[in-house]
Amino acid sequence: MGLVVEDFPKELLVDIVKRIERTADRNSVSLVCKRLYEIDREQRDFLKVGCGLHPATEALTALCLRFANIKKLEITYFGWMSNSGKQLDNQGFFVLCSNCPLLTELTLSFCSFINDNGLAYLSSFPKLRSLKLNFAQSISSNGILSLVVGCKNLSALHLIRCMRVTSVEWLSYLGEFGKLQDLSIKYCKGISEDDQMKLGPGWNNLRHFEFNTVNITIWTHGCIHLSLLPHS
């Protein structure tokens, strides 16, 4: 009599599922049987969602409830148009924050309807270590400040094309009280090279720094842990 999935030990099935990297493949495997579905539900710790999330809030809620151990989440609306359905907004973002207690890494790209009020919900994530914002046109310096004050363990912050981020009070706060090791600021017109000095003593903790017009000879001084400094 041949073996069926139910005959295999759970440890073996977990190892098999972990080795499947493509999301589409994992989705297919989870449909094979209830046991693989449950293992995938328990083991999946990364989600990438975007324009196909419709209706956005309800769909994301369902995903978060199914995959309760999500640690890394990427939401991208690149290529979004008004006829693609509604984007995730502040209300939906609040639902996200209520259902992903283990979240440590978050990427928001082209999310036009999440503003400073929505970003403030992230302060409820004590484990959040990494935030990447790409083309976040509704988020300003105030939102970034509330984020860094609330997220005490933030060690990586990437800001790309965030045009409303201008004042750098948040950078001063990170320099004094933060644990920042990875800082990337690209194409944020409101932040100049001189503004980087606001990081102050925080420079000594940096291991990776990226700024689109940085002068290397200025910023490497005193950064004893800095290992990577790309520039353009």
Residue ranges and their predicted role:
Residues M1-F110, N115-S123, R129, F135, ...:
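N-terminal adaptor-interaction module of cullin-RING ubiquitin ligase components
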Residues A59, S82-N83, C151, I160-W170, ...:
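Leucine-rich repeat
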Residues T76, S109, N134-F135, H158-R161, ...:
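Per-repeat beta-strand-to-loop junction in leucine-rich repeat
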Residues K127, H231:
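ATP/adenylate-binding site constellation spanning eukaryotic-like Ser/Thr protein kinases
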Residues W203:
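Compact interaction modules built on cysteine/histidine frameworks
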Residues L206-F209:
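Extracytoplasmic/lumenal domain signature
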